[in-house]
Each structure stands twice: as structure tokens, then as C-alpha cells.
Amino acid sequence: MKKLLIILFTLSFSLLASAQMDSVRHEARYWAERGYFNKSLEALRQLPYDSLTVSDLRLRYDNFANLGNIDSLFYWGDQILKRDPYNIPLILDYTPRLNRGKVSDLGKRVTYPEKVIDICQKYRERDTTHILVNRQLAEAYFNMGNYDLAMPALKKLEAVGDTCFGTLYTLGLTYQRMGDYNSAYDYLSRATVLRNDEHGWCLFNLGIVCNKIGFGAEALSYLEMAKERLMPDRRTLFRMHKELAEAFRMKGENDFRLEELQECMRLADEKDVNELTYEMGQCYFILKQRDKAEELFRKFLDTSENKEYNDKIKSMRESAQQQLRMMMW
């Protein structure tokens, strides 16, 4: 009788614990589905580690993916594959992230091709025909710089009909790295057509290849298109230099501030010129280059005199006039 009671008590406790964990899992999914990824993680942390299912691990992985926490995402991706190395939905999400990598603290992009190769080769023990897995394997070989392995992997993809942009582009880059510029030209040309000449780096590499094989006119065309797509537009560059100038002003580094303002002037619209002229005059005044400061302050006052101006320009005019008077003392 005593043994029976112990068994019943243990069973009741297990059922209660199971029900509680199911409730926690439901809560975690509820929060994740509504975009509350940190709340979902808080719920999952209530589950003992040895009770976590693969689905629990995947929910953690997805939460960290949505939060942009790459290090934690990598950790939970590895935990899932330790339990289930053939988990194809996870592999198809995880390996592209590993191939893209992350930006290190030093600002350099770090990729993990060796890990991708291990994951893909393990999966290929069961299935060697999965195009999406084989793409990531080929990409990993390329990222390692092992073009002798990347090339046959990519050619096998092409042979089974995988002629998407990524495969053609990586084939073109691989031929380029191997010095076969005619083949590189063929594949990069096909790749850029698929992207309607909108992929800047494809155009850039195609321009380089055209130069290598003596197609100067084509090289100019592709490189000009690459420049348009890779360079920020003029107003974006103007804003960037303007913000750099402001940062140098706050640091008190007016020589560098002046350089940035000169870049702004080169990119400026007419409406920006008066304010820039005043700010450059300020820099020269602080740097004790009085002749240049006076010239710019007078120019600013002349060009803004007969125009409608707001409180900011009015304040600048008063400041310029005051600084001119100071220079006369």
C-alpha cells in the first residue's frame, strides 16, 4: 500500500510539473508571436535546462534572431544541432547566418566557414542532393579561400539547374580569384542581368574583369554603374560631412572641422551656402587666420543681407558682425 501511494504521489507530481511546463511553453510562444521576445525568453528561463525540448531551443534561437543577438543565436543554434544534427529547417536558417558572419569589436566582419562545412557535411551523410545545403557548403569553401573545393561544388549546383544570382555570382568571383577572367566575365555578366544591373559589387567586379580581358568600354560602363550604386547620394554625403563637422566642433578640433565644412561646401545646395560660409569663417577665426575669417564673414553678411532670414541666420549675422568688430580692435 505504501509503495502504491508513493507511485501515485510521484505520478501526480510529474503530471503537475508537466502541466506547469506546458503552461510556461504556451506563455513563451504567446509572447514571441506578439513580438515580445525578451518576455518570451524570460518565460523559457523558467524551464530546467534538462527539460528543454528541441522546440524550446528553437524558440530561444528565434527570439535571439529577432533581437539581433548574434552570439546567443549562435550558441543556441549549436545546442540544437548537438541534439539533432539533421534538423533541416534550422540548418537552412543557421548556415547562411554563419556564412554572413558578424562584425567584430574591431569593425571587421568575421565569418565561420569551418563550422558551416562541418554542419553541411554531417547533413550530407543522409542527403547529398539538397540544393540549399549544397549552396551554403560551396559558399563556405569560397569564404575560406579554398577555390579548388568551391569550384566543383558550384559547378554541381549549376549542373542540377541552380542558376540563381548567388550561384552565378559566386562562380564568377571564384573564376576571377583563380585568374580565369573569360569565365568570370561570362558568369558575372549573367549574374548582373538577373539583378537588372542593380548589384553594385557584381558590377564592380565585372568592371575589373573587363579591364583584365581588354574590354575597356564595357569596363567603364560597369564601373560607372557600380560607382552610382555603391556611393551614397550627394545629399547623404553632405549630411555625413555636416555631422562630422559638428562632432569635431564639440571636440574643439577646428582644423578637422574646417576640412569637413569644405567638403560640405563642395556638395552643398544653394540654400546651404550662407550657413556654411559663416561656419567656415568661425573656424578660421578660432584658428587665428584672421584674413580668411574676415573675408568669409563679410561674404556671409553681403549674401544674406537682402534675403529673408530666420532667427538662426539673424543670430549668425549678429555674431559675424561682433567678430568683425573684435578683429578691428
Where are these regions (language model features)?
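N-terminal leader/linker segments that initiate helical-solenoid repeat arrays
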Residues: A17-Y75, K82-D93, N99-V103, V110-T111, ...
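Start-of-helix register in tetratricopeptide repeats
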Residues: D22, S55, P89, L132, ...
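Register position in tetratricopeptide repeats
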Residues: E33, N66-L67, R100-K102, N143, ...
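TPR-repeat structural position
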Residues: F37, I70, S104-L106, P113, ...
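Terminal, low-structured helical/coil segments at or just beyond the last alpha-helical repeat
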Residues: I286, D291-W329
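Canonical tetratricopeptide repeat
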Residues: L59, D93-Y94, L132, Q136, ...
